[in-house]
Amino acid sequence: MSKRVYIAALGTETNQFVPFPTGLRGYQEHGIWHGDATQHAPTNFTAPVHVWRKETEKRGWTVIEGLSTFAAPSGTTVRKVYEDFRDEILDGIKAALPLDAVLINVHGAMVADGYDDCEGDLLSRIRAIVGPKVAIGAEFDLHCHLSALMLDSADVLVGYKEYPHTDTMERAAELFAIIADTVEGRVKPVMARYDCRMIAQYRTSVPPISEFVVRMKSLEGKDGILSVSLSHGFSFADVEDVGTRTLVVADGDMAKAQALAEQLGKELWDNRERYATKYLTVDEAMDRAASHNQGPLVLADRADNPGSGAPGDSTFVLKALIEREIGPALFGVMWDPMAFQIAEEAGEGARIRMRLGGKSGTVSGDPVDLDVTVKKIARNVFQPYGPVMSPLGDMALLSSEHVDIAICTRRNQTFHADAFRAVGAEPADYRVVIVKSAQHFYNGFVGVAKEILYVATPGAADPDVTRWPYTKRKTPFWPKVADPWK
C-alpha cells in the first residue's frame, strides 16, 4: 500500500524587542499558498516543501500538500493570524488521515500573542491528531529556540547547518530520508538536546566555527548517529529556551544521543571566544574605514538587519559617515517608503532636501536631513539570495556629498551586491560599503569586498545580548555571566 505523507510550512522569526507586530499582511507579502506552493517557483522557505513533494512522488507515495506561508522577521505575530494558520494545517491533517508521515517546515523562533513556542504548540497538536505511530519531522532555521516540547512532539528535527542558509534544500532531503527510513522501519530515531548556556552569533562560512560544522557532518551516518544540528538560537526574544543548543538524532540509543549532544555542546563552550562573532563599535568601524585605501571595505550594520526583525531604517552609521566625511561610501539598502515617494515625485536628476530614516522609533535613531540628488529610480527590484530571488520593492539611489544611499519600499535585508547595481551603483567603485544585514550578505559580497567587518550599532538587533531584558530564561548564560555553570 502506498504511504501517505502530509507536507506544509509555517514560520517567521520573531523579534520581541521591536515596536511593531507581524500581522496578516506580513505573510501576504511573502506568499500564502493553500496547498499549492509546489505549483509555484520556490522561495527560500517553500523550497523544502518542493523537495518533499519530489522525494515522496519519486517513491510512488501519495503526497497531500497543506498550507505554506512565511513572514519576514518582525515583531510578535498577532494571535488570530497564528491560530488561523495553525488550524488550517491541523484541519488539513485531519482531512488527510490516515497518514504515515507529516513533514513541516518551520522557523523555530516564531512567537505569537499568547504563544512563546509556536512550533512546539503546532507539533504537539499534530501529534495529538495523528497519534504515536505516525512519523513527524520538522526542518528548522538554526536561529531557533529548541524547546523540549518540540523534541517531545516530533520524531525527527533537522536544522540548517549553514549561515548564510545555503543548505535548506539539502537539510530537507536529509530530513525526508530519515523520516522515510522511520516509516519503513529501518530506523527508530530518538533525540537529545544540550543547553550550552550561551547566547551568541556564529558565522559558519569562515573558520574556526566552519570547522565545527564540518565536524558535525562527519559524525552523521556513523555509529548509529542519524543527524547532528547546532541551534545557534535567536537572541532577540524573551522566551525560556533562548540560547545555543546542540541536537543529536540517534537510531534507538538515547544514551548515545545525549552523550554526543553534551560532548559537542561542551566543545562549543570551550571555544566560545573563538567561535562567537566579533564586532566593532561604530567609532572603531569609522576609524577602519578612514584608513582603508584598497576598497571596498564592507561593513555589516548588524543591529539594523531586517533579517533579525529590525526595521532597516536606522541612521547611526549614516550619521557617522557624514560627520567623519568618509567616502566615497555606499549605504543601504534602507527601508524608507516615504523617502522613495518624494524621490519618485522629484524624478531622476532632481536636487532636493530629503529627510531619511529614523521613522520606526528610538531603535532607529533620529532622521537625517540631507541635500541629495536623485540618481536613479528602479521598480520591482529583486536581488539574488542563493537559488531564489528576494524582493526589495521599488528603489532609489540618492547621492549626497560623500555617501550614496540606496532606499527601498519593501523591508528586506541586503543579500547581494546586485541590490545596489539595480539602481546603478557598483559596490566595487566605492571605498566603503555599508550593508543592512548580519551575515546573509556574505556570499553576495565576498567576491567584491577587499575586507568584511561587522559593526555593533545600537538598534533593534543589537548583538550585545547583555543589554536585553531576558525574564523567562531560567538558567544564567554567557556572556552576561562569565561562568554560568557555577
Model-derived segments and spans:
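Active-site histidine-anchored catalytic micro-motif
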Residues: 6, 11-13, 75, 79-86, ...
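Extended hydrophobic packing segments that form well-structured cores
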Residues: 46, 65, 269, 381-486
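N-terminal amphipathic/basic leader segments beginning at the initiator methionine
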Residues: 2-58
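Hard-cation-handling environments
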Residues: 202-402, 406-410
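Structural motif
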Residues: 4-6, 62-64, 100-102, 134-138, ...
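Internal, active-site/partner-interface "lid" segment
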Residues: 183-212
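Low-complexity, highly charged intrinsically disordered N-terminal segments
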Residues: 53-73, 77-81, 85, 89-93
